[in-house]
Curated annotation (Swiss-Prot):
It is found in: Cytoplasm, Cytosol; Cell projection, Cilium, Flagellum. This is Tubulin polymerization-promoting protein family member 2. GO terms for molecular function: tubulin binding. Probable regulator of microtubule dynamics required for sperm motility. In contrast to other members of the family, has no microtubule bundling activity. The gene is TPPP2. Keywords: Cell projection, Cilium, Cytoplasm, Differentiation, Flagellum, Spermatogenesis. Residues 129-149 have a biased composition (Basic and acidic residues). Belongs to the TPPP family. GO terms for biological process: cell differentiation; microtubule bundle formation; microtubule polymerization; positive regulation of protein polymerization; regulation of flagellated sperm motility; spermatogenesis.
Length: 171
């Protein structure tokens, strides 16, 4: 049972932390684990309780907890969440709540296209000179789409047929 809890611990420890190895968890991810797994129910166990337990089990000046400290925290939260049960039984119930859980990304902000926003952000609907600033895929062309680049490769400024002299003379 503890190995499944350890896997859940690692999944939450790495969540949102690109530099994390999954061996230590910060307070943010600890709170997320408690919320997503249903340990924090808002009545018997609140977010304040979770923060207090985290501060209690972590080292004095540390910002993260190890899996051993996490187990201590779960024992404390288990006794609070499942009142009247033995500490081992409460811990077992906590681990059952954690089984197979992953960090949830519900409620994460997504791009919206409400009202006129879709009209303004869809490059295929652009008209006039703005249309020339994007290719067919909608990717910007950069400076080539913003400025008319003149070709100054002729003999004089008005000469348009650069490189055609030899072709005419060889007939």
């Amino acid at each position: 049972m503890a190995s499944e809890a350890e896997r859940t611990f690692q999944r939450f420890a790495v969540f949102g932390e690109s530099s994390s190895s999954g061996t230590e968890m910060n307070n943010k991810n600890f709170s997320k684990l408690c919320k997503d797994c249903g340990i924090m129910d808002g009545k018997t166990v609140t977010s304040t309780d979770v923060d207090i337990v985290f501060s209690k089990v972590k080292a004095k000046n540390a910002r993260t907890i190890t899996f051993q400290q996490f187990q201590e925290a779960m024992k404390e939260l288990g006794q609070k969440r499942f009142k009247g049960k033995s500490p081992d039984e409460a811990l077992e119930n906590i681990y059952k709540l954690m089984e197979g859980k992953d960090p949830a990304t519900t409620g994460v902000t997504k791009a919206t296209t409400v009202g006129g926003v879709s009209r303004l952000t869809d490059t295929s609907k652009y008209t006039g000179t703005h249309k020339e600033r994007f290719d067919e895929s909608g990717k910007g062309k950069g400076i080539a789409g913003r400025e008319d680049v003149t070709d100054n490769s002729g003999y004089v400024s008005g000469y348009k047929g650069a490189g055609t002299y030899d072709k005419k003379g060889s007939n």
